[in-house]
Amino acid sequence: PLFDPDWADNLIRLATSADLHYAYLEIDVPQIEGQSYRFPEGLDCEFISMEAIEAAFKGATDPYDREHVTPWIARKWQQFQKGSITPSIDYSGMKWSVDTQADLDFVRAVYMELAGIDFRMNNVIDLLTRKPELLEINGQTWRPEWIKAQ
């Protein structure tokens, strides 16, 4: 619910300019070694080329893989051209996805605070910088390095 279309646009530009089969925002992709900076969980965004989707359609036999596609691609990681966007600050401790009532309460609080504006990731970061107590709603802990230089 806290999706940022600007990051999606950046991801599409990266994927199309580099002719990638798969591109993603760094959230939690254990296949890539050495990456430590992550976007907030819930800001997930992926680009999958038609070529990769067709390969998954032809190669995936497990019902789970046929439904979700990405796990099959992850297991065949070496055969695809891939890339990612990594943030300049590590936001991996932030949880913006909705899996529990507390997560929903957090997202609702963010929406209430940012009501009336077409907000992006930076607006949410700015809000949480001003009101870090919002993070406590779903058990997040504020880290000073999350303050984004404007």
Briefly describe each language-model feature range.
Residues 1-38:
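Conserved donor-nucleotide/metal-binding helix-loop-beta segment in metal-dependent transferases, i.e.
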Residues 2, 47, 97-98:
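Short aromatic/basic micro-patch
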Residues 32-45, 89-90:
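A recurrent flexible, glycine/aromatic-enriched loop bordering the glycosyltransferase active site
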Residues 45-57, 101-105:
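Conserved nucleotide-sugar donor-binding
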Residues 52, 56-73:
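Conserved catalytic/acceptor-binding region of the Class I
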Residues 67-150:
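Conserved alpha/beta core of the MobA/IspD/sugar-nucleotide pyrophosphorylase nucleotidyltransferase superfamily
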